Amino acid sequence: MTTTSASTTDHLIDQQVIDGQAGYTKSFLNIYDLAVFKGTAPLAWHCSPAVSRQMYDTCLGANHVEIGVGTGYLLDNATFPVADPKITLVDLNPNSLAHTAQRLNRYDVTTVRANVLEPLPLEERAYDSVGMSYLLHCVPGSIKEKGIALKHAAAVVRPGGVVFGATVLSSGVPVSARGRWTMNYLNKRGDFHNQEDNYDDLRDQLAQYFPRFQLTSRGCVGIWRAWTTD
């Protein structure tokens, strides 16, 4: 079952924000899993999709929000703690929302079109978990600027709830020659905006918005779990 909220993004949105999600066309979404989870993640970023799947299996709550939904690959392959989870999908791209909602139609799914750089149009302190995988490197600005997305995610998580995710970093982590070439190419296309994204800034943003967090890296991907105050 899928329900859809009214859009909160009808006003003008920064063009770079639009560009960062515009590549998620219906045709690209059909090959996204192959391109990302069989392609760039293991071959360019040196981060196996098994790492992300393990994070989802251990962090997902019964009432979950996914921000930047892609195709729903990770949610579709995840083990939820309950048989009938509630899932709220948040994205700026209607194609991604529709594709993922259809893929997860065995669950109770709500879609919300929203900009992660603005406060989320969701109930505060109401959700068990928020996932933000492979999102921030597509959002314009440095980590110091777009780290506000972490604040917005934290605002909707219940006390003691978890915000988790992964993002491709350009410095402070090992970047292979193939990874650097791919990163530069995607930044030139406007698909990525991570040329200023580094590990230390990500750590500082997590520390600013959460009392407790874990941050690690696999290849050039920063991976975090962060908990709100009990």
UniProtKB/Swiss-Prot annotation:
One of its GO terms (molecular function) is methyltransferase activity. InterPro entries: Methyltransf_12 (IPR013217), MeTrfase_VrtF (IPR016584), SAM-dependent_MTases_sf (IPR029063). The keyword S-adenosyl-L-methionine applies. It comes from the Bacteria. The keyword Phosphoprotein does not apply. It catalyses: demethylluteothin + S-adenosyl-L-methionine = luteothin + S-adenosyl-L-homocysteine. GO terms for biological process: antibiotic biosynthetic process; methylation. Keywords: Antibiotic biosynthesis, Methyltransferase, S-adenosyl-L-methionine, Transferase. It comes from Streptomyces thioluteus. This is Demethylluteothin O-methyltransferase. Pathway: Antibiotic biosynthesis; Polyketide biosynthesis. Belongs to the methyltransferase superfamily. Its EC number is 2.1.1.353. Disruption phenotype: Inactivation of the gene yields a mutant that can produce nor-deoxyaureothin and its C6-hydroxylated derivative, but not aureothin. Methyltransferase involved in the biosynthesis of the antibiotic aureothin, a nitroaryl polyketide metabolite with antifungal, cytotoxic and insecticidal activities. Catalyzes the methylation of demethylluteothin to luteothin (also called deoxyaureothin). Is specific for its gamma-pyrone substrate, and does not act on the alpha-pyrone isomer. It is an enzyme of class 2 (transferase). Gene3D superfamilies: Vaccinia Virus protein VP39.
